Regions:
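Bacterial N-terminal signal peptides that target proteins for export
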Residues: 1-7
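C-terminal motif of bacterial Sec signal peptides marking the signal peptidase cleavage site
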Residues: 14-17
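Acidic, serine/threonine-rich low-complexity disordered tracts
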Residues: 19-116, 122-123, 138-230
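Intrinsically disordered, low-complexity regions
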Residues: 36, 127-130
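C-terminal partner/receptor-binding element of secreted or periplasmic proteins
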Residues: 128, 134-139
Length: 230
């Protein structure tokens, strides 16, 4: 089975889980495949020349879409929802997937896990980050990332973080604009190494439309944008 057909079948299965009607499914699958079919060599490989993603294309879908870029790997991919749930006192947890099964998990827009990238984030302590993004939190908080490496097993990275509120701005994503608050999460480890995560949070309903988040030394920063919301 060639890569294009495999991608098409996996995409169709994902869309089938989110929408009904065979005619609608085939139409959406065809539209979305025009975007993802050039990503057949795997997620976040060097970026191919992608078709232009327009609002008209996105409006033709009933499934949400998440764009993820990894500048360190010169990679770009489009993901669709796999699992969503809302945990009491913890907030919504959303796992997104590509057609090849590589996954990214966000809680309230905050990165908590990756799968299939290599050197994946396997577990985290992001409670302080989530509180900050959702409007609460203290003056500082810990951030922990557990990274599954191919050579050293699980490597833990611990940071101490503070938050900075940068004010309200207008964010544009594929022909639509959103009123957002710009947030920075500034973290240092025991050696003095510094990372900075960025979040753009809708001032109306708290949707985290766009982020830039650290995912470990091998992956570097991951940039996410919600192209189409649930």
């Amino acid at each position: 089975m060639n890569a294009r057909l495999t991608a098409a079948l996996m995409l169709t299965a994902l869309i089938a889980a989110c929408s009904g009607g065979s005619d609608e499914l085939r139409t959406q699958g065809g539209r979305y495949l025009t975007v993802v079919e050039t990503l057949q060599n795997g997620l976040f490989q060097p970026e191919p020349e992608l078709p232009n993603v327009t609002r008209a294309l996105l409006d033709g879908l009933t499934v949400p879409s998440l764009e993820v870029a990894v500048p360190e790997r010169d990679g770009l991919a489009y993901l669709v929802p796999l699992i969503s749930r809302n945990d009491a006192n913890l907030g919504p947890l959303d796992t997104w997937t590509t057609v090849d099964g590589t996954q990214l998990t966000l809680r309230s827009g905050v990165l908590v896990a990756t799968r299939g990238l290599g050197d994946d984030v396997t577990s985290t302590d992001r409670r302080g980050s989530i509180a900050f993004v959702t409007g609460g939190g203290g003056a500082n908080w810990p951030l922990r990332l557990d990274i599954q490496t191919s050579t050293d097993g699980v490597v833990r990275q611990d940071f101490n973080c503070t938050g900075q509120r940068n004010g309200r701005v207008t964010l544009e994503i594929v022909e639509l604009t959103y009123p957002v608050e710009s947030l920075s999460e500034i973290c240092t480890d025991s050696s003095g190494a510094r990372i900075e995560n960025q979040y753009f949070v809708d001032t109306r309903d708290g949707t985290v439309w766009q982020t830039r988040q650290w995912a470990g030394e091998k992956i570097g920063y991951m940039n996410t944008r919600i192209l189409k919301k649930k």
